[in-house]
UniProtKB/Swiss-Prot annotation:
Entry remark concerning the domains of this protein: Has 3 domains, the large (RuvB-L) and small ATPase (RuvB-S) domains and the C-terminal head (RuvB-H) domain. The head domain binds DNA, while the ATPase domains jointly bind ATP, ADP or are empty depending on the state of the subunit in the translocation cycle. During a single DNA translocation step the structure of each domain remains the same, but their relative positions change.
Compartments where found: Cytoplasm
Gene field: ruvB
Organism: Helicobacter pylori (strain J99 / ATCC 700824)
Name this protein carries in UniProt: Holliday junction branch migration complex subunit RuvB
Residues involved in DNA binding: 310, 315
HAMAP family per record: DNA_HJ_migration_RuvB
Database matches in CDD domains: AAA
Pfam families assigned to the protein according to its UniProt record, in alphabetical order: AAA_lid_4, RuvB_C, RuvB_N
Ranges where the record places region Large ATPase domain (RuvB-L): 1-182
Residues the entry annotates as binding ATP: 21-22, 63, 66-68, 129-131, 172, 182, 219
Enzyme Commission numbers on file: 3.6.4.-
Length: 336
């Protein structure tokens, strides 16, 4: 399947641009108000006690600001943040090298934390609970455990698949936050702020139109903003007006609901099953897509907006999907 403009993964060329558009202060971070409020209280209390923050877990679909909010936490705590990802921590020595280089109150951010191996988790437990690193030297009867004290630090874990976390690891987080999709008004404000940073003039209705098609996700909103900006430049227009915006979004294949070809193919597959549950492996095979991508990228927004139901037997299209695709149900009074 061709690359999606509404793909939720960060593309390589976007990394530096994302950093430049990233909010640096609470007042710059739009949305997630309940999470922000709770974090501000926790940060204030930790600073008054002169302690590190409790370990915390952020979970939810990609692109909702887990990394950005972690950077703000570090700035508010006036400390350093070390960013890594679980797939990069292959051996206990990798984790030990990271932990022993942390300073007091530093923040360690581990993305995709659900992908840590059980062996790495075992090393992490005493580090989280007792700020102690247990290293085993040798093997068999001659093996010895060396205990190394660590400075108090805060572990921030981020995951798109909280259900895959082991219970012992999940229980060691003092705070757990579910990141929510953003409203169109929040996304419109994010888009206008980003456009200002890019020195790009944009009409209010253009920002609103991009926001409507951004699947409740800032990462997608910023990506669409930059692509529409390219169209405006090619059209020799210094202003992103509604006409250019609509033309660009239609050319990019993103409809009024934020759906693209992959979303519509997914929904058509379910709707044509006429109420019969469709298994994830069947969907993945039909779409030639990875099961994890379907679960983490395609389904969350569709599920949150009522276009499908997940059951023990598989996925089922809702009446909302049948109405959208104009695919009638064979027996609507008994299907749902």
């Amino acid at each position: 399947m061709k690359e999606r403009i509404v793909n939720l993964e960060t593309l390589d060329f976007e990394t530096s641009q994302e950093v430049s558009l990233r909010p640096n202060l609470w007042e710059d971070f739009i949305g997630q108000e309940k999470i922000k409020s709770n974090l501000q209280i926790s940060i204030c209390a930790a600073k008054k006690r002169q302690e590190s923050l409790d370990h915390m877990l952020f979970f939810g679909p990609p692109g909702l600001g887990k990394t950005s909010i972690s950077h703000i936490i570090a700035k508010e705590m006036e400390t350093n943040i070390k960013i890594t990802a679980a797939p990069m921590i292959e051996k206990s020595g990798d984790l030990a090298a990271i932990l022993t280089n942390l300073q007091a109150k530093d923040i360690l951010f581990i993305d995709e934390i659900h992908r840590l191996s059980p062996a790495i988790e075992e090393v992490l437990y005493p580090a989280m609970e007792d700020f102690r690193l247990d290293i085993i030297i040798g093997s068999g009867p001659a093996a010895q455990t060396i205990k190394i004290d660590l400075p108090p630090f805060t572990l921030i874990g981020a995951t798109t698949r909280a259900g895959m976390l082991s219970n012992p690891l999940r229980d060691r987080f003092g705070m757990s936050f579910r990141m929510q999709f953003y409203s169109p008004s929040e996304l419109s404000l994010i888009i206008k702020k980003a456009a200002a940073k890019l020195n790009q003039d944009i009409k209010e209705e253009s920002a609103d139109e991009i926001a409507k098609r951004s699947r409740g996700t800032p990462r997608i909103a910023l990506r669409l903003l930059k692509r529409v900006r390219d169209f405006a430049l090619v059209k020799n227009s210094s202003l992103m007006d509604l006409s250019i915006t609509l033309h660009a979004l239609n050319e990019l294949g993103v409809n009024e609901l934020g759906f693209d070809e992959a979303d519509l193919a997914y929904l058509s597959l379910l709707a044509n099953a006429q109420g019969r549950p469709v298994g994830l492996n069947t969907i993945a095979a039909s779409m030639r897509e990875d099961e994890g991508t379907i679960e983490d990228v395609i389904e969350p927004f569709l599920l949150a907006n009522g276009y499908l139901e997940r059951t023990a037997k598989g996925r089922i299209a809702t009446p909302k999907t049948h109405a959208l695709l104009k695919i009638p149900t064979l027996n609507p009074q008994t299907l749902f």
